């Protein structure tokens, strides 16, 4: 069962969001060897440990529903989606061990145990449950993915993805020398660079610029100059 006292006052959805998005931004935007970039591996380990804590419960937002013609609709939907509502610490709670829903008349709050959704199949199951429940407020959020509960699931999916783990491994073990940028394919993807040079008959610098324009989100003149060590005179 779950009670309000079980919620963590330190690690919450905002903590996970900052850890996930900041990690990706610093890994991309800072040079290899930068202390802040290297520190992110410790942040990853600490975040992983927090998510693996069976006592951690994350707030996943609320829904509101009031219809005089269907006063039991919210309760019925909760019980058909999560399980039977029971009184715990004077609260009406449905709890399947992963997702808990606290019902209070016209409102229901969601709480999620991240330790229990470690696999993609578990994430998919709880995601489907939350999509069903948050559909009651589709007029407020416009689309299901804008509800905090669904955004929390997507953050968990991002943080636990193979791509995110590969990013962590790359920070720990990179071929790029200290001071260089992963965004420079001359340093980070020499094999791919050589293939592009051969196929398109380009110089090393031209091939690097071609790849940056093709794959990176912000290959501005300023950024490319920083990544590649180019100056206006060059």
Q: Which residue ranges define each predicted feature?
A:
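Short amphipathic alpha-helical interface segments
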Residues: 199-219
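Catalytic cores of nucleic-acid ligases and guanylyltransferases
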Residues: 181-183, 196, 212
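Long, compositionally biased low-complexity segments enriched in polar/charged residues
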Residues: 1-186
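Residues within the helices of the helix-turn-helix
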Residues: 194, 222-223
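Short amphipathic alpha-helical interaction segments
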Residues: 227-234
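Short, Lys/Arg-enriched N-terminal segment that forms or immediately precedes the first helix
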Residues: 186-199
